Every structure is written in structure tokens, then in C-alpha cells.
């Protein structure tokens, strides 16, 4: 919807306390013999707030929504996102985001539909062309709906008092990332079986997420983003 294309506040907390920072980073590194591991000094999980549904001027304006950017670096520390976009690579790469191992927080309750990804998260691909420019800077257009990659996205969380692992997978199609049976792109949370058969995973890791609060609860937001 429109609010997701525009974006929203980065209300990401640093700790379980009611104290939030606007920007939160989690870093993983690939270690020989160990696979993807949490980098030393990195936060281990995201603490987020449940989305509230509002309307402004007759338009659906949910808040908060979270901008989520993914950056890949090579062993030299050089940004390598372009390798998944340029020279036709954008036609065979797509990130998928699937909540797993869903459970209530200490003050929450299990619900019958907790294992339905659509009740937990909503994600919109907001990749841009060029890939390394922004619409905010008027240097790029949002093209994620017609060519989803997932290096840039908007995510909102639909239930509070939940913990889960957000499985992030980067699909690499042998020839295409389009579902051959439907002629469309698979939804962000569920790559189809036939798509999986026709490609491989470049990235497959999970990030813990805790949805502590809902939109009506008071939370301090710290301006310092360091």
C-alpha cells in the first residue's frame, strides 16, 4: 500500500526495556567450518513494535513500519550488493522472509494462527533503480513490485507479544526467479516447491525477532543512531 512505498519511522529498540533507537543493525559473518555466525559485538536480535492500523485522509497509514536494508560485503570489506543486481543478476535473485519457531513472549499467549506467516508480518519489496540510489533523494524509482530482490524493503509486524526466527533466504534461480506455473513472483514468505527445484540458496540464515509492544503503548525513541 502507499504508506509502505513511502516508508516510515525506524523505531527499533536496543533492548527489551521501553527505550528505542531509530536504527538497529545486526551483522553476520561467514566463517570457515562454521557457516554464518553472529559477528562479535553485534546485537543478537531485533526488538520491534506491533503495527497499528490507521487512516489519514481516507488512506491506510499503518505505523510503525520498518525500513529494512540488507548489505553484503566481501572479505575485503567492500560492498557487493551490485553482484545481485547488475548484468541480469536481478532477474534470478530474490530474498524471502519467513517467520518460524513462533512462540509467545513471557506475557503473551499462543494463538491458533501463529504459524500463518501472513498473520505475523507484512513485507513489501521497495528495491530501487538504480539499486544504490534513493527515491527520497529523487535519484531513483521504486521498482521492487515489478522486480522483487529484497535488498531494500518495508516490513511491519502484525502481532505483539510474539517471538520468532525470521528466516532470510536469498534465492538464486538457475534461469529465472519467476514461478513457471503462475508466471508471477512467489510471495515474500513462501517460495514454491517448483521454484526451489529450479534454483539454490545463496544465503540462508535466521534472525531472532521479539515483538514486545503494540502501537498504543508508550516507548521512548532515542535520537542518537550511533
Question: Where do the PLM segments sit?
Answer:
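Residue-level recognition of well-ordered beta-strand positions that form the cores
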Residues: 29, 71, 169-171, 210
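Bacterial Sec-dependent N-terminal signal peptides
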Residues: 1-10, 226
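Beta-strand-rich structural segments
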Residues: 68-75
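Short beta-strand elements
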Residues: 22, 181-226
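N-terminal edge beta-strand
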Residues: 18-61
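Exposed beta-sheet edge/beta-hairpin loop segments within beta-rich domains
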Residues: 56-66, 84, 131-184, 188, ...
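Extended, polar beta-sheet/loop recognition surfaces of beta-rich domains
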Residues: 78-136
Amino acid at each position: 500500500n502507499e504508506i509502505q512505498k513511502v516508508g516510515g519511522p525506524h523505531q527499533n529498540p536496543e533492548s527489551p526495556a521501553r527505550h528505542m533507537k531509530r536504527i538497529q543493525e545486526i551483522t553476520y559473518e561467514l566463517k570457515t567450518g562454521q557457516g554464518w555466525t553472529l559477528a562479535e559485538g553485534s546485537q543478537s536480535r531485533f526488538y520491534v513494535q506491533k503495527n497499528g492500523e490507521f487512516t489519514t485522509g481516507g488512506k491506510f497509514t499503518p505505523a510503525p513500519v520498518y525500513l529494512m536494508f540488507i548489505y553484503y560485503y566481501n572479505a575485503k570489506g567492500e560492498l557487493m550488493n551490485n553482484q545481485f543486481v547488475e548484468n541480469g543478476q536481478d532477474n534470478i535473485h530474490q530474498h524471502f522472509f519467513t517467520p518460524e519457531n513462533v512462540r509467545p513472549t513471557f506475557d503473551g499467549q499462543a494463538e491458533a494462527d501463529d504459524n500463518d506467516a501472513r498473520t505475523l508480518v507484512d513485507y513489501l519489496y521497495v528495491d530501487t533503480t538504480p539499486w544504490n540510489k534513493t527515491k527520497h533523494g529523487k535519484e531513483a524509482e521504486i521498482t521492487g513490485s515489478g522486480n522483487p530482490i529484497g535488498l531494500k524493503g518495508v516490513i511491519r509486524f502484525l502481532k505483539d507479544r510474539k517471538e520468532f526466527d525470521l528466516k532470510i533466504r536469498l534465492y538464486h534461480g538457475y534461469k529465472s526467479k519467476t514461478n513457471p506455473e503462475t508466471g508471477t513472483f512467489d510471495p515474500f514468505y513462501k517460495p514454491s516447491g517448483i521454484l526451489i527445484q529450479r534454483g539454490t540458496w545463496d544465503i540462508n540464515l535466521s534472525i531472532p525477532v521479539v515483538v514486545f509492544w503494540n502501537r498504543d503503548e508508550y516507548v521512548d525513541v532515542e535520537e542518537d543512531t550511533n
